[in-house]
Every structure is written in structure tokens, then in C-alpha cells.
């Protein structure tokens, strides 16, 4: 964790606030470090789209859990509001995942969507759109790369076998 995390944790404890405070520590994106021959965050591979997140809230959430549901960045603000006992604004498109963290079986999304638009500063990375379910991922490229991709994440979690040309898929 970042060096300031310990300072914040110590302050909350000394002030008697640590048991009634929600602390969220997260990145803004994943990052590829050579997987798929790439180094960056601008692809729809698992290394780039899986974002690390830790949440501590002793009064609301049991510690030590790993949430396997597909959560998106748009879900963070509604979750923070729910932790404070507030409803999300009607224009917010995300959902609170607090009930999931509390072990409740609630209806949840079965797919996520991804989009990245070509940037002048990163001309080697094409515009792409994708959809991911618990099992499958489809990536459609525009421009630079000429082959779309389709993966069975259950059989190939590291996305090494592109099934786009496989007739059974």
C-alpha cells in the first residue's frame, strides 16, 4: 500500500474513528507488464481491466472477502453513498455493491462493456469495443489491428487462444 495509508490508519485508530469509517484503497486501472506482448493499460485484456480494490469497514463489511462479481468503476460512488446510508442520484448508472460485500444474494449484472477510442498520443492502440461475461469475452477492433478476439475465460483465463475463427463459437 501507499506510504500514506499507514498514517491514515494510525490517525483513524488514535481518533477512535477506525471502526466507523469506510476506507477504500484502489487503483484507477490494471496494467499489462508484457502479457500479450504489451505494456500499458489500454487493452481489454484481464491484466488491464482488473483493478485492485481493498475496502475496510468493520461495521458494514466482514473482512477477508474476495468479491468475484463483475464490478465497474461506475459502481464505486453508489457504494460509497450506500455505506453512508444515502441513495444514489437518479442519473448515476452504477449500482451499489455493498449488499454483495455483506453476503447478500442480489440480482447483479451478467456482463460488462468496454470501450477505448484511438488517441493521437498512442497511435499503436486501436479503437476497441468489448463485452465480457463471467465466461466469455469479445473484443472488436477498429483501425490498427485487423483481427477481432473471442475468449472462453473459463477454459483460457490468460486469453492465449483466440477463438474468433472457431466455428463452434
Question: What residues fall within each predicted segment?
Answer:
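A short beta-strand-to-alpha-helix junction
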Residues: 1, 17, 40-51, 61-78, ...
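Long, internal low-complexity/basic segments
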Residues: 1, 81, 124, 155, ...
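Histidine-centered active-site microenvironments of extracellular/periplasmic hydrolases
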Residues: 9-65, 72, 93, 118-123, ...
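Secondary-structure boundary motif
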Residues: 14-17, 103, 165
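C-terminal cap/loop subdomain of S1 sulfatases and analogous C-terminal strand-loop tails that border
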Residues: 29-35, 74-77, 82-153
Amino acid at each position: 500500500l501507499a506510504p500514506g495509508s499507514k498514517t491514515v490508519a494510525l490517525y483513524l485508530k488514535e481518533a477512535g474513528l477506525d471502526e466507523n469509517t469506510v476506507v477504500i484503497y484502489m487503483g484507477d486501472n490494471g496494467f499489462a507488464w508484457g502479457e500479450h506482448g504489451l505494456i500499458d493499460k489500454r487493452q481489454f485484456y484481464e491484466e488491464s481491466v482488473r483493478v485492485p480494490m481493498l475496502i475496510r469497514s468493520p461495521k458494514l463489511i466482514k473482512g477477508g472477502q474476495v468479491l468475484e462479481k463483475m464490478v465497474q468503476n461506475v459502481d464505486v460512488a453508489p457504494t460509497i453513498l450506500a455505506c453512508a446510508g444515502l441513495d444514489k442520484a437518479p442519473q448515476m448508472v452504477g449500482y451499489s455493491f455493498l449488499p454483495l460485500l455483506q453476503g447478500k444474494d442480489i440480482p447483479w449484472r451478467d456482463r460488462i462493456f468496454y470501450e477505448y477510442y484511438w488517441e493521437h498520443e498512442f497511435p499503436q492502440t486501436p479503437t476497441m469495443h468489448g463485452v465480457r461475461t463471467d465466461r466469455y469475452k469479445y473484443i472488436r477492433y477498429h483501425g490498427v489491428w485487423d483481427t477481432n478476439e473471442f475468449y472462453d475465460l473459463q477454459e483460457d483465463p490468460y486469453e492465449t487462444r483466440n477463438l474468433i475463427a472457431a466455428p463452434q463459437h
